Amino acid sequence: MELLIDRFHLEIPSDLEESKFQQWEELKRTPVQLRAVNVMRLWLEYFCDTDDEKALDLVEAFANNALIYRHVNGMRGMLMRLIRRCRQGSGNLNRKMMQPKMQPKPLLPPSLSQLCFLNISPIELARQLTLMESETFLRIYVPECVNKAWASSDARHRASGVVNVISLHNHITGWVIETILNEENVTQRAAITSHFIAIANYCYQINNFSTMWAISSALNCASIYRLNATWALVSRKDLDIFSEINQIIQPTRNYSRYRDLLDRVNPPCVPFFGLYTKDLTFIEDGNSDSLWSDSRLINFAKRSLAADVLYEIRRFQFVPYNFVRVPSLFEFLDLHFKPRMSDEERYERSLKLEPRQSSSPYGGNYHRHDFTSYDMIPDEYFMKRLQENGFT
């Protein structure tokens, strides 16, 4: 902010002829000052946080003391209104959201006192998961996404919103894995797997790509993927749905199918945040902060690339979902989100449920290769980047 204020106070060149002062004033200083004030306005509208007290003080002092020029004097009142609104906690306009009018009625089981996973509608589970994901995603402030703040040693303080999104994603993935592995009966395991596929499919339909991705990642993990006897009892219809979901998140051509889908989607939407951390990490690590020819020159191309990613994040923070929050289902999910097994323990549990064998004993109309031909192509580089950014 200090540099922006310094830019506003553009000094008159020492060698400027008096006869050319008016021209310099109109063509140089006035446009520079208007742009500087406009950047302050944009920051107050979209990026300021109530914690940015020092920066707010600077802008307030600037507005009271510097905006005396006739061509920007009208902006003083506007800046002061935005400062007051930001300090009241409503200055960030991307938090002022449109609210759909109609709320769909929750699809609840007969009894909420003793909830069982398979007795809860996959549609309603998808809605409640979407509310969880959306509320967490909407709490992310853009500054948290700059300079890989989420991967810093003080990430919990600098990027709490991003950290919470990553944590929720990991909890959902672990919940899916352990819910399947905790079932001894193979028929019930297959039913649970189909239930999760139905949840992922409805999440896809309502643009909750974050939960969809988390469920797909869980079902594709080694502990679940190898359960041939379980997959043999999953219907062909459900397998086709799961295959289509996997096609959407394939890494081919830098996840082009998912990115194309995201470009066309209308909010509300919960995007998969892991792809944003991948893109921002690539931009941060692959581009210098300044131009190689002069370290004093800022590399604006790098900032422009990052701004494109940040703009897309903000685009999905305008419109929230309008589902009815069901407290008992939130409590059910919170209770089961607590992981109880390590990755090694999960794999050992998987081997205990279905020991290694050359082929599925269920055979019949199902062959594992029928499914894997559609399955997601592994992207080791992407998975490594996700793990570095906290995703499991």
Q: Where do the language-model regions lie?
A:
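Eukaryotic small-GTPase/lipid signaling interfaces
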Residues: 1-392
